[in-house]
Amino acid sequence: EIRASDWSSDVCSSDLEREGLTVIQVIFGKKGSGKTKRILDMANASVKEAKGNVLFIDDDKSYTLSLKPQIRFIDASEYAVKGKAPFYGFLAGILAGNYDISVIYVDAFLKLAQAEPAELVDFFAQLERLVANAQCDLVISFSEDAENVPESIRKYQI
C-alpha cells in the first residue's frame, strides 16, 4: 500500500511546479533579428538547471558547434520533416522513446512546419498537449513579427 507520506517531497513539489506553467515559449522576430542567437544561448544556459536531457532541433547542421556537448542535436532535414503532421509525428516519436527530456528547442520552426502563422492555431494546441503530457518544455524560434501572429499563439511569447 502506498501512502501520501511515502512519496518523496521532490515528486510532489515538481508536480505542483508544473501546474499552470506555459510549457511552450516562442521567440518571435524577422530574419536577422537575433532569434537564433537567443535560442542557442537559452539552450546552452538550460543545461545547468535541466533535470533531464536538452534537445535542439534545427533544419540543418549549421549551429551544431554552437551548442554545448551535453545537448542532443537533431538535424530534422535528415528525417524529411516538412509540414505540420510530419513535425508533430517526429516530436511525438522523440518524446515516446525518450522519457528523460526536460526541454526541446526548435529553431527555424516555420520552415519545418511549412505553414503560415494563421494556420498554426490548432497545431499549437496539439503541441501544448503533447509536451504537457511528456512533462517537457518546448521553446520555438518563429520567423515572424509577433503582431502578425494570431493572439492564441502570441500568448507564448517570451
Feature names for model-found ranges:
Residues 35, 83, 87-90, 101, ...:
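Amphipathic alpha-helical interface surfaces
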Residues 17-18, 158:
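Charged, low-complexity C-terminal accessory regions
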Residues 1-15:
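Single conserved hydrophobic/aromatic residue that forms the stacking wall/gate
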Residues 22-94, 149-151:
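Conserved P-loop
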Residues 25-27, 54, 101-106, 138:
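Generic beta-sheet signal
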